[in-house]
Structure formats: structure tokens, C-alpha cells
């Protein structure tokens, strides 16, 4: 199995195997692995944005990726918000699981598609949206949540 296939399969799985794997690696290897994943995510994001543009060209506004879309994430309560931004240290004593079913098939297809796509030959500029760590509104909300946690204890 290719190392990138291994990484992406762990990354897309709905468990903490990816975090356990990264925690067991040295910093340089972890950063290199994260860079590989971001390259594939940038490719997926480019595909999504081009698809959104096609929909908007025929008059359908796809709000999830629209420039005018204001809602970044929907939270039903503050606990969901805290879970998103709470970075708990990862315990490395657990086993890393690898899903070799449909998720693995998806990863292989993604890698082949990226390799054979005409988009892969063009330089992909990094495509990013709001970074919650740098956004003042998110920072203020996090400060409020942290102060509430301190006050409640």
C-alpha cells in the first residue's frame, strides 16, 4: 500500500487513528504527512469550487461554497463549539485502524483522478477560507467560552 493511500484512508476515517498515527511520528514526519494531505484537500476543494461555479453559471446558488455564504458552521449548543476547537492531547497507546472497504476505494480513486486530471498539471494556488484562529469574532467567542468554563468550575 502506498504511504499516501495509508495516510488518506486514516485521515478520512471516522475515528482517531490518524491522530494516533501522527502522535507516534516525529515532528518532521508528521508535518510532511500533513502537507501531503493538504495537497489532496486542496485538489478536492478546487473540484468543489469549480463545480459550484458551474452551478452558479446556470443560475443555481450553491450556498455551502458561495461567496455570500455567512454561516461557517451550525452549532446546536456551545458544547459542539467547544468540541470543535478543543485540542486534547492524543494518547498514543491505542491501535491504528485502517478501513479497507469503500473508504479505501475512494482514496485510491481520488489519487488516480488527481494524477490523471488536467487540473493536476496546473499550479493549484492554496485555497483557504476563514481560519478561526485568526478571525477576531471566533477569537472573542472562544474567550467567552473559556471564561465561562473557568467561572463554572
UniProtKB/Swiss-Prot annotation:
This protein's UniProt keywords: Host cytoplasm, Late protein, Virion
Pfam assignment, any one: Pox_J1
Induction: Expressed in the late phase of the viral replicative cycle.
InterPro entries in UniProt: Poxvirus_J1 (IPR005006)
Keyword Ion transport: no
Signal peptide: none
Subcellular location: Virion; Host cytoplasm
Family named by the database record: Belongs to the orthopoxvirus OPG100 family.
Function: Late protein which is a part of a large complex required for early virion morphogenesis. This complex participates in the formation of virosomes and the incorporation of virosomal contents into nascent immature virions. Plays a role in DNA packaging during immature virions (IV) formation.
Name of the protein described by the UniProt record: Virion assembly protein OPG100
Native species: Vaccinia virus (strain Copenhagen) (VACV)
